[in-house]
Amino acid sequence: MADGSKVFKKTSPDGKITVYLAKRDYVDHVEFVEPVDGMIVIDPEYQKEKKVFVTMTCAFRYGRDDMELIGLSFRKDIYVQSCQVHPPLPGEKKALTPLQEKLKAKLGANAFPFSFNMATNLPCSVTLQPGPEDSGKACGVDFEVKGFWGDDVEEKVSKKNVARLIIRKVQYAPETAGAAPHAEITKQFMMSDKPLQLEASLNKEIHYHGEPIIVNVKINNSTNKIVKKIKITVEQITDVVLYSLDKYTKVVCCEEMNDTVAANSAFTKAYQVTPLLANNTEKRGLALDGKLKHGDTNLASSTTLRPGMDKEVMGILVSYKIRVNLMASRGGILGDLISSDVSVELPLILMHPKPAEGTTSAEDVVIEEFARQKLQGEQDDDEDKEEAS
């Protein structure tokens, strides 16, 4: 059966409403975002006297749950869309998508459609990795689709009457890339007539998660110093721009090479580095893609901005750079005491490749339970415990 026919569902703890979505990842193509289409099944008894709503919320969580107990709120809703699915409002009937038509045929008369179009200026899903002692929900940007019944969409409803699904807004690598990054520096040392030249480059502009990154290093050492150490690091830079100007830089890969470059000699070599979350699972605050199942998560993808987009509404911006550093010193026992560093930086774009387009099958849909997933180190909150009971 084609992958396009898989459908995810989540039922409220009271069993009265069930929300169905075709997927969990919605692609931001920079110019537009894939619509969020689904169906909600309502218990016939509730259709007689209850209103049923579906909302989609983009929220930014930047503090711990336990701080909210003393009256401090560390969650900000960036964007909220809502619709009343029952009873349907006049003039709001839309044509069903092919998948909604199949679900309607499968689920029957108690199923009602809903659809949301995301704004193009919303951030992508990003999760900040919790520390070993952290509890509650992880900080970051998330998207939630929520179905519930009540008298008004703004009404505070019991958690047992709500079906919640966390979805992701993701970006994939563009089909066309720019020039491969290149940087060079010339360093003049005291007591040396000629300089040391360091040149570094990548083979391409965009790299995929898990793919080895080739770093080409070229050294022209015309000095009387010896290059004793070559170190390549990959750094993740996370800008939290929504509520402050906080910036966090974390090393996600570090390789020290044993190669040396003698005085008055040249050196050229291509090195491989591969930044992986598997080697950084203990680093608190590391930005991850918004998948909330630890085994399925990776380092956050580089943020792609549309020209003219307001950065402040993006919540969290993620970028990467590669630093090539040389340690040059004189020979002898005391040479390292007066060593000098020479370094260059290269921008790195780290993303997922665009997957193959899914096909919509004429066969019956396959429905899969939508279980809430957690990061390693993240504990169940009260909502999850209530839903599990």
Swiss-Prot record:
UniProt GO BP: G protein-coupled receptor internalization; signal transduction; visual perception
Top-rank taxon: Eukaryota
One term of GO molecular function: G protein-coupled receptor binding
UniProt-listed InterPro entries: Arrestin, Arrestin-like_C, Arrestin-like_N, Arrestin_C-like, Arrestin_CS, Arrestin_N, Ig_E-set
Tissues/organs with expression: Retina and pineal gland.
Record Pfam families: Arrestin_C, Arrestin_N
Gene3D superfamilies hit by this protein: 2.60.40.640, 2.60.40.840
Keywords: Sensory transduction, Vision
Function description: May play a role in an as yet undefined retina-specific signal transduction. Could bind to photoactivated-phosphorylated red/green opsins.
Stated family: Belongs to the arrestin family.
PANTHER family: ARRESTIN (PTHR11792), ARRESTIN-C (PTHR11792:SF19)
Protein known as: Arrestin-C
